[in-house]
């Protein structure tokens, strides 16, 4: 899980979602998991 000030899609399988007010990226590739904050 990467924590970044700006989250972006890193590939076509990445999905940007909101969980508990946080913007997150979920993907089939675990390296692409990101959270804003």
Swiss-Prot record:
Pfam families: Ribosomal_L36
Domain of life: Bacteria
Disulfide bonds: none
One cellular component (GO) term of this entry: cytoplasm
GO MF assignments: structural constituent of ribosome
Signal peptide (residue range): none
Keywords: Ribonucleoprotein, Ribosomal protein
PROSITE patterns: RIBOSOMAL_L36 (PS00828)
GO biological process: translation
Similarity-based family: Belongs to the bacterial ribosomal protein bL36 family.
Protein's name in the database: Large ribosomal subunit protein bL36
Organism lineage: Bacteria, Bacillati, Cyanobacteriota, Cyanophyceae, Oscillatoriophycideae
């Amino acid at each position: 899980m990467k924590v970044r000030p700006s989250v972006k899609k890193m590939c076509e399988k990445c999905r940007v979602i909101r969980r508990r007010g946080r913007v997150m990226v979920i993907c089939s590739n675990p390296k692409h998991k990101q959270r804003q904050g």
